[in-house]
Amino acid sequence: MDFFTEYGEGNRYKIEEVIGKGSYGVVCSALDTHTGEKVAIKKINDIFEHVSDATRILREIKLLRLLRHPDIVEIKHILLPPSRREFKDIYVVFELMESDLHQVIKANDDLTPEHYQFFLYQLLRGLKYIHTANVFHRDLKPKNILANADCKLKICDFGLARVAFSDTPTAIFWTDYVATRWYRAPELCGSFFSKYTPAIDIWSIGCIFAELLTGKPLFPGKNVVHQLDIITDLLGTPSTEAISRIRNEKARRYLSSMRRKKPIPFTQKFPNADPLALRLLERMLSFEPKDRPNAEEALADPYFRNIANVDREPSAQPVTKLEFEFERRRITKEDIRELIYRDILEYHPNMLREYLEGTESAGFMYPSAVDHFKKQFAYLEEHYAKGSTAAPPERQHNSLPRPSVLYSDDRPQNTANIAEDLSKCVLGDNTQKMHQGSASVCANRVPQGGAARPGKVVGSALRYGNCSTSTAEQYEHRRTDRNPALATNTVSPRGSYP
């Protein structure tokens, strides 16, 4: 295979500066010189040091390949490592997002009811797609929702997500469950083996929405007991029947012994909110999981009467067991390395063909762009530590594959807030309908070519309103067949992404 034919894009990405650094590695902003688009290249270091971390990375790579939707972050490409059996780092590339919802809430007190409605609609629409694929996110919180100045949100960080199959042992869901307590459903408080349903994600979305309305977390529990205490302060003491369904004995005893509390009316807790919004929020924050609406039911709520359109709220095909068979067995570092390598090949169709046909070389495969990225990342990291923003030396090599970087995490944010941009994000009158009767929020001011703000990176933004094509047309352009695990006699002509 002629590497320089398939990967002759060595000068396409101009690496600019470090925009994030943490235990996982480093994220650099870069310019796609072909399109003028800002991207972020994330280097994840030593991914096989711990099998649990490598498994989380594999899980996320797989899910972001399979769950392609405008409200979910999208991996476009992953650089092919130079050696199949010896690589330790991976480089993934996303378009640059300016911030996350945590920063938006923290920095912006000018959000309007239209913002609240549109934000919740996007989250529920993305969640419907996730849940109909039989996937449960398990870690929804403002830091895992990316935002840009077009008011576009994208769900990210699928490292704790799980795929639910009818015969999957319950324990598989909870082997590494460490989701943030503040957004954790009450049936999960203190229990790693509670009944597992999509309602846990609906609860999290309800907590996020309440935080949007008030500007502060709704249930900032200091521990499990305090978490249950402040939940019941708002919702009232649950019924005896509801308490009996909580599997954790200590939690059951605590709830049974607490003084009887009356629920606080949501109109009192959120005095300035739209009554329709509060009615939906109250349903989403039901103590009993069975009383919460699923994402599809929530989208049909009267609160969204002016923007909902079922044609733009697609369902996903369920994820196949074959994609996640590794969750059902004990795997070694070597197993994980091979599985991650196999998934990376989805972005390199020619190499995938050779791999499936058994003709691929097992050793050093080509003059890798990764080697050149290493030098530039090392240069930037050194200068980043000294506070310099100097750009790295230009590469003298033209073998860089196309992009793709990974999910966000909880590293401390040094994000320049997007309050100015977002406060100027003018929302269209929500009685004004878009194409085929669906209203859409529009940003009259879209940042053009400004410096990327440090912070979260990932996923492309779906433009709303002032666009050359309608939302539906943009979505249809993105809608391609999901890529199930390939049989040994099948090769995807373009990989799983355009």
From Swiss-Prot:
The modification Phosphothreonine is found at residue 175. Belongs to the protein kinase superfamily. CMGC Ser/Thr protein kinase family. MAP kinase subfamily. The keyword Methyltransferase does not apply. The gene is MPK15. The active site is at residue 139. CDD domains: STKc_TDY_MAPK (cd07859). GO terms for cellular component: cytoplasm; nucleus. ATP binds at residues 19-27, 42. Residues 388-411, 470-498 are annotated as: Disordered. PROSITE patterns: MAPK, PROTEIN_KINASE_ATP, PROTEIN_KINASE_DOM. Coiled coil: none annotated. Activated by threonine and tyrosine phosphorylation. It comes from Oryza sativa subsp. japonica. The modification Phosphotyrosine is found at residue 177. GO terms for molecular function: ATP binding; MAP kinase activity; protein serine kinase activity; protein serine/threonine kinase activity. This is Mitogen-activated protein kinase 15. The lineage of its organism: Eukaryota, Viridiplantae, Streptophyta, Embryophyta, Tracheophyta.
